[in-house]
């Protein structure tokens, strides 16, 4: 099995374990039915069409089921998404100068000015308002994540 996804041996064996939880009959492939059973046991309630879409998304050979290499490729892709989460966290720290977990208008103005963006108070307030879901006048981490992911 080639490891083009740069996964560690440990990750591969964890994914193998997860795969066998899905692969109820142990035939080496996950059907939409098996996927549904696991999803429901995790408190999800996917429709038949959603399950089919999920399988189709990773079913590289088009045989209607997910085999282990396809499962591995899907997990590796998900792991890459985690990197972007780390990048968002780093970006948040840049703005959150005092490290109190929120970005104030002053912090936002400071960073934007350092980036060469001369903004008026109104423009800074507008940026805060756009990202400030709960209306408390500052941007917390979850609001920052939402803003970054909606770009």
Curated annotation (Swiss-Prot):
GO terms for molecular function: calcium ion binding. InterPro entries: CALM/Myosin/TropC-like, EF-hand-dom_pair, EF_Hand_1_Ca_BS, EF_hand_dom. PROSITE patterns: EF_HAND_1 (PS00018), EF_HAND_2 (PS50222). The keyword Repeat applies. Ca(2+) 4 binds at residues 132, 134, 136, 143. This is Calmodulin. Belongs to the calmodulin family. Calmodulin mediates the control of a large number of enzymes, ion channels and other proteins by Ca(2+). Among the enzymes to be stimulated by the calmodulin-Ca(2+) complex are a number of protein kinases and phosphatases. Keywords: Calcium, Metal-binding, Repeat. It comes from Pneumocystis carinii.
